[in-house]
């Protein structure tokens, strides 16, 4: 079946697209279809060119994917978009391709909102109209799925260590045992991942009903990660002593840097202070003024100056 580049058609006011990721295992091609949804309803896309809705559907729960785009690929990577017994394709970058393979279910369809696929990246007008709607998209998602990337720099150790940090019966031992210095170093390396420097993430996390953090084949709940980072921050001076006493780090107490300056620490603080939520995690109000939010977000990166404003509206 010959594949053609997919052509998004214009969205109507109040609509956005979702990616229906088809089940498969291992190295099988990434296959999907795009559906159009509005508040409270979703519609099938009967034409890959016109996106004309055919029938209303009960809203399917979806996850919003939060990730870094990464550099352009030297080798062409694509995801298949299936419609009307024809196969189309959209070029994707390596980090997204890796994320989709890791998150894909072997036996059931899953719905995702992914900016690179659900927004026509070749249409500036559509991007301008969809960006202000991101707060609605993230608020409606049943979960935000955070993709940090593949395993490297002992990240698997770090992901497991997060769970250990939340065991209060052994936490003090972790803070004072020199044998744990490598685990603290692995956690610090995880906290330096590029994802934690994106300005958009503050909005994405603050708006999330639930969020999970994924790295390789490991995952933890966002709140567990946030709690572990807060504990790490509160004990950083004691933990730095471990590195002073550890021959594995050449008695180098400054290996960790200042934990409070790491993007992950700033994100945990920022995302907790932007909104007040109800008991069921619904957004109630801003806790900070626009000026205060702008100042708080100044440490996070944005590729376009306008993104700073969009990220907090």
Task: Write out the residue ranges for each language-model feature.
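Metal-dependent phosphate/diphosphate-handling catalytic cores characterized by acidic Asp/Glu clusters
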Residues: 1-113, 119-125, 129, 150-180, ...
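Beta-strand-rich binding-surface signature
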Residues: 59-64, 109-116, 135, 143-145, ...
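Hydrophobic, mid-to-C-terminal alpha-helical segments
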Residues: 126-132, 142, 185-313
């Amino acid at each position: 079946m010959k594949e053609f580049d997919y052509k998004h058609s214009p969205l109507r006011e109040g609509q956005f697209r979702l990616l229906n990721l088809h089940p498969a295992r291992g190295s099988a091609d990434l296959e999907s279809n795009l559906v159009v949804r509005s508040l409270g309803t979703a519609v099938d896309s009967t034409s890959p060119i016109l996106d004309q809705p055919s029938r209303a559907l009960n809203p399917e729960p979806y996850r919003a994917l939060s990730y870094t785009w990464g550099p352009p690929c030297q080798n062409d990577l694509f995801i298949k978009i299936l419609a009307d017994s024809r196969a189309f394709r959209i070029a994707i970058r390596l980090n997204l391709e890796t994320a989709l393979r890791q998150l894909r279910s072997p036996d059931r369809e899953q719905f995702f909102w992914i900016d690179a696929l659900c927004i026509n990246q070749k249409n500036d007008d559509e991007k301008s109209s969809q960006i202000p709607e991101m707060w609605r998209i993230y608020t409606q998602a049943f979960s935000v799925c955070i993709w940090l990337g593949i395993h490297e720099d002992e990240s698997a150790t770090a992901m497991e260590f997060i769970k250990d940090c939340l065991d209060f019966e052994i936490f003090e031992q972790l803070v004072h045992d020199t044998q744990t210095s490598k685990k603290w170093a692995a956690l610090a390396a995880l906290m330096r991942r590029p994802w934690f420097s994106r300005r958009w993430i503050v909005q994405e996390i603050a708006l999330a009903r639930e969020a999970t953090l994924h790295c390789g084949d490991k995952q933890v709940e966002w709140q567990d990660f946030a709690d572990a980072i807060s504990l790490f921050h509160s004990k950083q001076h004691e933990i730095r002593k471990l590195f002073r006493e550890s021959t594995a780090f050449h008695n180098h107490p400054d290996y960790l840097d200042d934990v409070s300056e790491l993007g992950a620490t700033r994100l945990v603080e920022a995302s907790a202070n932007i909104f007040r939520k109800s008991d069921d995690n619904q957004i109630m109000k801003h806790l900070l003024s626009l000026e205060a939010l702008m100042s708080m977000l100044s440490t996070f990166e944005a590729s376009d100056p306008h993104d700073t404003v969009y990220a907090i509206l």
